[in-house]
Amino acid sequence: IGVGLIPSGSEDPYGLRRNALGIIQIFLCWGWQVPLISLIEDGLRSMGSKLKLEPEAIKKHVLELFSQRYKSHLDAEGFPHDAIDCVLSTGLDSIVDIKAKVVAFSDLKKQPYFEPLAIAFRRVVSILKEGADGQVDPLLLHEPAEKKLFEVYLKLHEPVLQHIQKKEFDQALEK
């Protein structure tokens, strides 16, 4: 990709798609927690002056290639498309964590409380788009429901972050 050979349609003369899938499977098999972006950046540094595209453009193409391959891989394993898309939309930080998150999200979707939770989440996101910086000013909360929601947030914020740091994604989602 760095030298201008970007796979497209049926064109992939160097098997980059197959190689990307192989890398994904190796990471999953061995449980490697190496950030993909670090590997890409190391590769870019090693290529130096041989690059024909800007490093940021190369990173974008490589991440897109891995995202497409990983999406196909997870789809072949039978995970719901929306769960895959949801998790991949957060980025390709850790190949292993992505699969764990897709599993956790897929399990959450099976719960009877998921649909009302998803509706409430969409509403909150819609409201937050109108906000300035994403910070909550407790002095602006007047309605009892607003105050209660903020109390619940304060109560759950740290435990959820701790579960995420421990890679306990299912427990983070259950909170």
Question: PLM ranges: what are they?
Answer:
Residues 1-175:
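Amphipathic alpha-helical "coupling" segments that flank catalytic cores
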